[in-house]
């Protein structure tokens, strides 16, 4: 399990999900699992090794299967799913929740969200967001810039000219991601993503000048929210 969490409200905003039912405000519900799950095997009656921390995705296959079940069997499997109290159940392809789903959602306090996306597309989007938000991370003293599409982390002692180097690169058409404090997240085994803490984003501190808002002085094209780390100097 990740030591970090992300609110269901942020995930819903990122994936453009709509609410069918929620027991409380979505920003009060925290998600800690980096994976999502299609509960087809659980709906077939196999409940072992079910990870209730994952968001559950119900697509056309699962919904078609539920339609073929008898009322009593459908209720049994749906109640079992909701009784695990996952952080949310998401219906894809614009499908509406069954009346039984709404009943058990209210009984067990499980949010039901809806998406118009295809199931695989939504799962990919959610996993990407979860991997970014829940990734292991560290903060390093340095400057992160994008030079010809490559993310370059400039390290060194205080006062050696890291920020001055970065601003000269910005003047030449390259982009600033973070100055002074660089937050590095390992979003996959092969990718480290660098960004700036929100309170200092787009700012750079220069000797003899002070703090400069790079986005205002050089335009929004001179800054970037994040960049993958390709080189350390």
Where do the language-model regions lie?
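Charged, amphipathic alpha-helical linker segments immediately N-terminal to NTP-binding catalytic cores
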Residues: 85-88, 94-129
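Structural motif
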Residues: 54-57, 87-90, 110-113, 151-153, ...
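P-loop NTPase nucleotide-binding/switch module
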Residues: 129-149
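Structured core elements
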Residues: 144, 153-155, 177, 183, ...
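Conserved nucleotide-sensing/catalytic segment adjacent to the nucleotide-binding pocket
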Residues: 178-231
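Glycine-rich phosphate-binding P-loop
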Residues: 149-177
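Flexible, charged surface loops at secondary-structure boundaries
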Residues: 48-52, 81-85, 146-147, 225-227
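Gly/Thr-rich phosphate-binding loop signature of adenosyl cofactor/nucleotide-binding cores
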Residues: 1-81
